[in-house]
Swiss-Prot record:
Domain of life: Bacteria
Gene responsible for this protein: fljA
Record bears the keyword Coiled coil: no
Name this protein carries in UniProt: Repressor of phase 1 flagellin gene
Organism: Salmonella abortus-equi
Entry keyword DNA-binding: yes
Leader sequence residues: none
InterPro entries: Flag1_repressor (IPR003223)
């Protein structure tokens, strides 16, 4: 049986940097923390925390999420387990929800170690939307707001902004792509 190499950029390329450099994400996390912005954190196993970033330790790649800004009831979120960081608009009502840290950080899937910079950058430059297929089954669509080696920023149709980590993506296409 012959092995066929996939050369399609929508499946990504092998990451040049491993482990991931979360410095750009760290800047965004600090901004969200200082401005008490409500966030939705989605893990690689589709567990969801809706709350605030109470504290952040960039050296340990660790977010402490809480149900209140700078709150004391804190859940540890490892950046290595984070699939999506979504900023929620202040106009909508959300139910705050926390899950135990061991459930959130459980790695059900192996990180892809893939880099989707090429397809995301191409869509960004062409002004077309992207469609992101997550390993755990969710499909996201929106317009890219920027990309680096480990994540892509996406503005969704409801106006929310999210950072999607490449390690938990199985494929990214342009939103106008049809199979």
């Amino acid at each position: 049986m012959e092995c066929i190499a996939v050369n399609d950029i929508s499946y990504g390329r092998e990451a040049e940097i491993w482990p991931r450099d979360y410095s750009m994400l760290a800047r965004r996390v600090q901004f969200l923390r200082f401005n008490d912005i409500l966030v939705r954190l989605v893990s690689n196993n589709a567990r969801i925390i809706t709350g605030y970033i109470a504290k952040f330790n960039p050296r340990e790649n660790l977010i402490l999420a809480s149900d209140k800004p700078k709150g004391n009831k804190r859940i540890e979120v490892k950046l290595e387990s984070l699939a999506i960081l979504e900023e929620l608009s202040g106009n909508d009502a959300f139910n705050l929800s926390l899950v135990p840290a061991d459930e959130f950080n459980l790695q059900q899937y192996t990180p892809s170690r893939r880099d989707y910079f090429s397809i995301c950058n191409k869509c960004y430059k062409q002004g077309v939307g992207i469609k992101i297929y997550m390993k755990y089954g969710q499909v996201l669509t929106g317009k890219t707001t920027g990309v680096n080696a480990c994540q892509v920023g996406v503005r969704t149709s409801n106006g929310n902004h999210m950072q999607v980590m490449f390690d938990w993506v199985s494929r990214i296409t342009s939103s106008d792509y049809a199979e």
